[in-house]
C-alpha cells in the first residue's frame, strides 16, 4: 500500500507542473466520439440535431443537466411542468445493467432515460461530453451503457500533506464527469491528524502541524509535531463544516465519500496527543502501533468512529489495518495479557482480534468495515471487505473465501509513482506507472471462478502524498491517470483499446487544463525492445503518448534535430551497439522535454552460460532467472518491470564464453532506488581466466552515487580493456545491511 516511506523533498519541475495546454492540439477524424469512459454500445445514424436557442426541460430534470447545458452552450435553459419533447429525461426501470442509461439523439430531439436516478446522472455526463465536443450540433445516435463495476474509486492521502477542501471539491467534480463514484479520504496517518474530534481535541491541537514540509526531514529525523498556532507551523485539519460541505457536494454528484481512520498501525501522530494509547505509555520515535491490550484503546477507537459516522453516511468505514510494525506488542504486558486471555498465538492474531472487535462495533451501527489486505493475516473478520494493494494475491484469497474485494494493486494504480522517466519530473515515490500501464489493468483475475468474480466490486487508484506537497502537484499525479481508471472500471473489457483511449484522452487534456486542472501533459516516448537470438539482432520500436507529435532520433548518441530521421513505425534494428536518442517534436519544433536515451547491445555474452558462485537472486525479483543478465534485455526506469534482477547478497557470477575470446569492453548497469531499499554496489570488480581456475583482476570501480540520493539513479560500471579470456567473473559488493538490495539488468561483453 504505502510502499516504504523513507523520503526526501525536492523542488518541483515547474514547467511540467504548469501543464501547458498549447501542446495538446491533436486533430482526430470528425466522426470519432471522444467519450471517456467509452460506452458499451454506440449506434450512429445519419444527420445531426441542432439544439434550440432556448432549452426547455421538465422541472424534475437533473440540476446537473440544466447547469451543464447552460455553461457549455451559453443558451438559456428554462424549466416547466411539462418540459419539451426536444429534451426529455425519463426513469425507465426496464433499462438493463448497473447504473444503466440510454441516450437517443434524433432529428426530433434528445431523450435521456435512466434505469434509476443514478443511471440518469451517468447519462447526463455522457450528454455533456457530447455537447463539449460537438457544440450545439449533435450527431444522431443511440448510446446504451451501464457500469462494469459498482466501485470506481480514487484515494487521496491528506495526512502527509494537507490538501484544502476546495481542491477536494474540484476533484469530486472531475470524478463525477468521468463516472468515478467512490472518494476514499485518507484522513489520518503518521504525517498528521486531519479529522476534527470534539471528544479528543488534542489530536488537532498537537498532531496536525509540524515545522517542515520536507517529508524525509520529518519522518527520518524526529517525527515531532508542534502545537496549533506555533509560528511557522505547517499542516492543517478540516472543520466539521468543511467535511459536511464535501460530503454534501459528493452526494449531489452521486459519489460516496469513504473516510479512513488508520489503526492499529500508522498511529504515531495519535501518541503525540494521547501517549497513553501506546504500549510504552509515552511518545516514542519507533512507536506507531496502538496498544491492543488496553481497553482504553478501544474506547478511543469507538469514540472516534462514532464521530466519524456522524459526519460520513457511507456504508463503508475504512480502518486501515496495514503495515503494523508489531515491534512492541510481544514485550508489552498488556498485549501479552490480552493474547493469553483470548488464546491468541501471535501478533498477527492479536491484530485480527482488534479488527474483528472494531468490525462488530461498526456492524452494530449499520456500517461495514473495509481494510487493506493485511487484515487477512491472523484471520479475516467475518463481514470485512478487503482492499488488495500488495498485488492481487490478497484479493484473490479473500474472494475465494467469499469476501468482497476492491482491487488496488501498487503495480498498476499507485499514482504516487513516476508517470514518465524521472528526468525533468517532480519528485515521486519511486516506481514507474505510465498511463498505459494503469489502463492495461483488468480488476478481475482470471484464476477466479465465475462465482468468485462477483466478489470483485471494482478498483481504486491511490495517491499517497509523501512528495506531493500541494494541490497542483496532486492534480498532476492524478490526471489523466484516473481517466484510465474510469474506463477500466466502467467500460466492458471487450470495447477497451489503449490506442483509441490515448487518442480520446489527448482531446480531454486541454479541456481539463481549461477547467483549471493541472494535468500531466502526456509527452513520454516509450521504447519496446525485442531480442531475436536466431537473427542475432535487437529491434527497438518507439511510440509517443501524443499522437500528433513526431519522434526524431539518432543512433550515435547525438541530440536529435528536426533534420534527424523521423520515426515512422518501422523498428530500428541493432546488430551490435546502438546509442539511441529520441525527442518529441510538434510541427517541426522540439517540445520542452528532455530527450530519452536508450542503449541496446547484441553483445558476445548473450545466451552464454552463467554461474552464480555464492548467492542467487532474491525470489521476489528474479527477472529472467539465470538468463536475466545475459539476455540483451535492458530494464526500464522501474524496479517493478520484471527486467531488473535483485539480490540482498553480493553478486558474484562467472560467465563461460565457450572459447577464448578477444575482449575490448565489459560493463554492467545497476540501479539505486533508495525509497525501496535498493542501493548501488560499493564496488564492482572484473576478473578474467582462460581455464576457469586461475583468475586475474582487470580492474575495480567504486560507485559515484551517493547513498543519500533520493531520485532513481542508474550507474554503469565500465571496464575498457584489451584482453583474451574464456571466463569472465563479475563481483559486486553489497555494502548495506541485511534486507537491502542491489539491482542489475545486464552484463554487456564486447
PLM feature segments, named:
Residues 10-19:
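Bacterial N-terminal signal peptides
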Residues 369-374, 379-384, 390-539:
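Flexible, acidic glycine-rich loops studded with aromatic residues
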Residues 2-11:
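Bacterial N-terminal signal peptides that target proteins for export
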Amino acid at each position: 500500500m504505502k510502499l516504504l516511506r523513507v523520503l526526501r523533498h525536492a523542488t518541483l519541475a515547474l514547467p511540467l507542473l504548469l501543464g501547458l495546454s498549447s501542446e495538446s492540439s491533436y486533430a482526430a477524424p470528425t466522426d470519432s466520439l471522444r467519450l471517456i469512459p467509452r460506452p458499451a454500445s454506440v449506434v450512429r445514424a445519419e444527420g445531426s440535431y441542432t439544439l434550440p436557442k432556448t432549452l426547455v426541460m421538465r422541472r424534475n430534470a437533473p440540476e446537473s443537466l440544466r447547469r451543464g447545458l447552460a455553461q457549455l452552450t451559453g443558451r438559456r435553459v428554462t424549466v416547466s411542468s411539462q418540459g419539451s419533447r426536444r429534451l426529455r429525461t425519463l426513469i425507465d426501470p426496464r433499462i438493463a445493467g448497473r447504473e444503466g442509461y440510454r441516450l437517443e439523439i434524433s432529428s426530433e430531439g434528445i431523450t435521456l432515460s435512466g434505469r434509476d436516478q443514478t443511471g440518469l446522472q451517468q447519462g447526463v455526463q455522457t450528454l455533456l461530453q457530447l455537447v463539449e465536443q460537438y457544440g450545439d450540433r449533435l450527431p444522431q445516435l443511440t448510446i446504451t451503457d451501464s457500469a462494469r463495476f459498482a466501485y470506481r474509486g480514487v484515494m487521496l492521502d491528506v495526512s502527509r500533506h494537507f490538501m484544502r477542501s476546495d481542491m477536494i471539491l474540484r476533484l469530486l467534480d472531475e470524478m463525477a464527469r468521468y463516472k468515478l463514484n467512490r472518494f476514499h479520504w485518507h484522513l489520518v496517518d503518521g504525517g498528521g491528524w486531519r479529522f476534527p474530534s470534539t471528544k479528543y481535541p488534542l489530536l488537532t491541537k498537537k498532531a496536525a502541524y509540524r515545522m517542515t514540509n520536507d517529508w524525509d526531514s520529518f519522518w527520518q529525523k524526529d517525527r515531532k509535531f508542534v502545537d496549533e498556532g506555533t509560528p511557522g507551523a505547517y499542516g492543517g485539519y478540516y472543520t466539521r463544516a468543511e467535511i459536511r460541505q464535501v460530503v454534501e457536494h459528493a452526494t449531489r454528484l452521486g459519489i460516496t465519500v469513504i473516510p479512513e481512520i488508520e489503526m492499529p498501525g500508522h498511529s504515531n501522530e495519535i501518541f503525540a496527543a494521547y501517549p497513553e494509547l501506546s504500549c510504552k505509555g509515552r511518545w516514542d520515535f519507533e512507536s506507531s502501533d496502538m496498544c491492543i491490550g488496553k481497553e482504553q484503546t478501544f474506547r478511543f477507537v469507538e469514540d472516534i468512529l462514532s464521530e466519524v459516522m456522524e459526519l460520513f453516511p457511507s456504508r463503508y468505514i475504512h480502518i486501515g489495518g496495514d503495515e503494523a510494525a508489531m515491534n512492541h506488542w510481544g514485550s508489552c504486558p498488556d498485549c501479552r495479557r490480552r493474547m493469553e486471555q483470548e488464546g491468541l498465538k501471535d501478533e498477527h492474531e492479536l491484530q485480527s482480534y482488534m479488527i474483528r472487535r472494531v468490525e462488530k462495533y461498526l456492524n452494530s451501527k449499520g456500517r461495514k468495515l473495509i481494510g487493506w489486505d493485511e487484515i487477512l493475516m491472523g484471520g479475516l473478520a467475518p463481514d470485512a471487505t478487503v482492499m488488495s494493494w500488495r498485488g492481487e494475491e490478497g484479493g484473490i484469497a479473500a474472494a475465494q473465501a467469499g469476501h468482497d474485494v476492491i482491487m488496488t494493486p501498487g503495480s498498476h494504480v499507485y499514482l504516487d509513482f513516476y508517470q514518465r522517466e524521472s528526468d525533468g519530473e517532480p519528485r515521486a515515490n519511486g516506481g514507474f506507472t505510465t498511463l498505459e500501464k494503469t489502463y492495461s489493468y483488468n480488476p478481475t483475475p482470471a484464476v477466479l471462478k465465475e462465482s468468485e468474480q462477483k466478489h470483485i466490486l471494482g478498483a481504486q487508484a491511490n495517491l499517497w502524498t509523501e512528495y506531493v506537497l500541494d494541490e497542483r502537484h496532486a492534480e498532476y499525479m492524478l490526471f489523466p491517470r484516473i481517466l484510465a481508471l474510469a474506463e477500466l472500471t466502467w467500460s466492458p473489457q471487450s470495447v477497451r483499446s489503449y490506442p483509441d483511449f490515448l487518442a480520446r484522452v489527448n482531446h480531454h487534456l486541454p479541456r481539463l487544463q481549461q477547467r483549471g486542472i493541472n494535468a500531466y501533459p502526456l509527452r513520454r516516448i516509450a521504447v519496446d525492445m525485442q531480442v531475436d537470438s536466431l537473427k542475432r539482432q535487437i529491434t527497438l520500436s518507439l511510440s509517443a503518448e501524443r499522437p500528433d507529435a513526431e519522434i526524431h532520433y539518432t543512433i550515435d548518441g547525438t541530440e536529435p534535430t528536426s533534420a534527424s530521421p523521423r520515426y515512422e513505425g518501422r523498428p530500428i534494428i541493432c546488430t551490435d551497439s546502438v546509442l539511441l536518442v529520441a525527442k518529441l517534436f510538434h510541427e517541426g519544433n522540439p517540445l520542452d522535454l528532455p530527450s530519452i536515451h536508450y542503449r541496446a547491445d547484441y553483445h558476445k555474452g548473450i545466451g552464454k552460460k552463467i554461474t552464480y558462485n555464492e548467492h542467487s537472486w532474491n525470489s521476489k525479483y528474479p527477472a529472467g532467472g539465470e538468463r536475466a543478465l545475459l539476455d540483451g534485455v535492458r530494464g526500464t526506469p522501474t524496479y517493478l518491470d520484471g527486467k531488473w534482477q535483485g539480490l540482498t547478497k553480493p553478486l558474484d557470477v562467472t560467465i563461460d564464453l565457450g572459447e577464448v575470446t578477444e575482449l575490448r569492453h565489459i560493463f554492467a548497469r545497476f540501479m539505486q532506488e533508495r525509497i525501496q531499499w535498493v542501493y548501488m554496489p560499493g564496488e564492482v570488480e572484473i576478473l578474467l581466466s582462460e581455464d576457469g581456475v586461475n583468475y586475474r583482476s582487470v580492474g575495480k570501480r567504486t560507485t559515484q552515487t551517493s547513498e543519500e540520493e533520493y531520485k532513481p539513479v542508474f550507474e554503469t560500471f565500465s571496464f575498457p580493456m584489451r584482453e583474451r579470456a574464456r571466463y569472465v567473473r563479475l563481483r559486486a559488493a553489497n555494502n548495506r545491511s541485511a534486507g537491502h538490495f542491489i539491482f542489475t539488468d545486464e552484463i554487456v561483453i564486447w
